């Protein structure tokens, strides 16, 4: 929200204007899209790479009029950030990174969320670390820092270096998005353990994949998405694509998993262009341009990936449930 409104704020010397276009992958989340639309900007949707579920950077050249990119690091994974950064620089564009599901992921030793003009993070309870609610936005320049600092607190200049000690001096528009001291303390205490939690999630992911592939009934029922080869991922969840020859079993099977204690979710919201809210805004697009995004919706789901070590009993329970798909 703050990053989006900062991009169009008149206080920012170089900024976007109402009507400017921005690129966003069709597999996205509502809070990645709607703040930019609320700023008067126009979305230009782009398909995803079926191997990573993230924005397909090879399609960027087709979006020649866009002034910004909202790049989403899905479930801890990433596009090729060097290619995206080079494209952004060559076109003098803005880049926002939605890093809400990828806290701690690194692309060639550089943290996701630090490539763009702004990086956004979520500390909701289901994420890598949690403060219960809220999140974080990072930026690169003093101008952007002071703008974000003011906008998060009603548009005050309170707390800024340029402040004239007037507690009620409103220098801009703004919101009330300040964290509580209590939630900040909870988040900071977990931040110290982030690297260990990332390692634990990776081990759990590897355990599940190996257990499934070595199951006596394994017959490539699922496809696991690929970590970008230049990425050291901080995994958010455990996504799967059901193979096409058994796709007709998906609905009944997911109902079975949920009723058995294995909670499932769509991969983000699937192809967001199918959401009812998009019809309200009459977005123009060709379905044939989003075949991978539709495949992610049709075949995909994900389950939780715990930070605590998965013991043998839980691992056996989970894999046995997942391997029952062909019985439906």
Predicted regions and their residues:
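Conserved coil-to-alpha-helix start sites within the AMP-binding
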Residues: 27-33
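Hydrophobic/aromatic ligand-binding patch that stacks against planar heteroaromatic rings
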Residues: 35-36, 87, 182
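PLP-dependent aminotransferase class I/II
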Residues: 68-72, 77, 81-83, 106, ...
């Amino acid at each position: 929200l703050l990053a989006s409104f900062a991009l169009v704020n008149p206080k920012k010397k170089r900024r976007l204007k109402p009507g400017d276009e921005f690129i966003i992958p069709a597999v996205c989340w509502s809070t990645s899209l709607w703040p930019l639309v609320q700023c008067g900007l126009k979305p230009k949707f782009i398909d995803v790479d079926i191997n990573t579920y993230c924005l397909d950077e090879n399609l960027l050249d087709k979006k020649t009029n866009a002034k910004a990119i909202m790049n989403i690091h899905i479930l801890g994974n990433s596009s090729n950030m060097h290619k995206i950064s080079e494209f952004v620089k060559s076109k003098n564009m803005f880049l926002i990174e939605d890093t809400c599901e990828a806290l701690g992921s690194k692309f060639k030793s550089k943290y996701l969320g630090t490539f763009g003009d702004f990086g956004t993070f979520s500390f909701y309870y289901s994420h890598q670390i949690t403060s219960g609610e809220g999140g974080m936005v990072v930026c690169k320049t003093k101008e952007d820092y002071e703008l974000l600092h003011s906008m998060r607190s009603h548009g005050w200049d309170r707390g800024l270096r340029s402040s004239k000690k007037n507690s009620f001096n409103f220098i801009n528009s703004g919101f009330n998005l300040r964290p509580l001291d209590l939630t900040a303390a909870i988040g900071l205490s977990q931040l110290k353990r982030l690297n260990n939690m990332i390692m634990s999630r990776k081990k759990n992911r590897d355990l599940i994949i190996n257990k499934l592939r070595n199951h006596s009934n394994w017959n490539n029922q699922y496809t696991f998405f690929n970590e970008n080869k230049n990425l050291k991922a901080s995994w958010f969840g455990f996504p799967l694509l059901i193979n096409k020859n058994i796709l007709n079993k998906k609905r009944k099977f997911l109902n079975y998993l949920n009723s058995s204690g294995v909670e499932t979710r769509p991969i983000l919201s699937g192809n967001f262009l199918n959401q009812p809210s998009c019809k309200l805004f009459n977005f123009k697009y060709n379905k044939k341009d989003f075949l991978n995004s539709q495949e992610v919706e049709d075949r995909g789901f994900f389950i939780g990936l715990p930070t605590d070590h998965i013991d043998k009993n839980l691992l056996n329970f989970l894999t046995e449930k997942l391997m029952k798909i062909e019985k439906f």
